[in-house]
Amino acid sequence: MHIIVVGAGIAGVCSAWYLLKAGHQVTVVEALDEVANDTSFANAGMLTPGYASPWAAPGVVKQSLKMLRAPAKPLVIKPDGSLEQIKWLWQMYGFCNATQFKRNRIHMHQLAKTTLNLLHELKQELSLDYHGLQAGTLEVFRAPADWQQCQNDTDFLNEHGIAHDLLSPQHCQQFEQGIDAQKFSGALRLNDDETGDCRLFAEQLTQHCQAAGAVFLFQHAVTELWLEGQTVRGVKVGEQTLAADHVVLSAGCYTQKLLQTVGIQVPIYPIKGYSMTVPIVDEAKAPQSTVLDYQYKVAITRMGKHIRVGGIAELSGWQRDKHPHNLDTLKQVLNDLFPDCADLDAAELWMGMRPATPDG
């Protein structure tokens, strides 16, 4: 069968590869001029089944109010007056209970674990090199109360066999010698978590897709799905129609917009995330893997000779404007935990729109 994949981010490229392996003819249609150039471009690079957990959780409303008042805000909500935003937030509130949280956390963990296993198979099969590291994740807790709560809340990790350790700040320096142990009360180490450069992975897998016969159409923005009766028969790119037996939507947030063209409503909302990428200037002071700051919800990830610092959850609608002040938060966290390890003046700021559902 001929299958069109809409979107050439990490989800689209991986979908194309597995469809090719199943014997299908594949065309990938992408609005931008290269693969992984939007949401997959510069994310935090975390491969963390142990950390996979819904945002919609008990107590998140109270936490959110504290975050909104913080000087360095990990959460930004800018009301846009739309019913869509209000409805999405209300739906998320409905998932912030213990029953829904536990169920969704199990699903997310299982999905993340399966995904990581498939990534290992691809890496071995195709000899992919994407700055991958298997050095675990370290989540640091600044406030003593947060650290105590972490120590009391390891049941899920134990029940699901997630290898972990509870570490003192000094013990953390065995894994991250450059970290400032004076800045936090304790840390949770998830031993089997990994890191990698999402964009680099997608670029290399694209080459294998093309070698296997996939066609990539860049600068082809899909405007709507093409219906024949009640069946999707392809996509429309402006005035042009591209026919296919099936269509796979992997267009991030814009999947929601495309489904609306055939009368289907899904609760996907764009949540902006920010990252900065900085060159390392002192190897001894630089992070070795991923370090998560619980208080600021920021991830610091080693990527070759650079460090990627990602975080911020900004709900401000579909506008793609960047807010440079968010860079200050990312710089503050990096310099606080790993002082003088990188050239902050050379920081490259990026913003991507996470496709988020209200269940977290």
Tell me what each language-model feature is.
Residues 2-28:
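N-terminal Rossmann-like FAD-binding beta1-loop-alpha1 element of flavoenzymes
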Residues 21-41:
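Glycine-rich FAD pyrophosphate-binding loop
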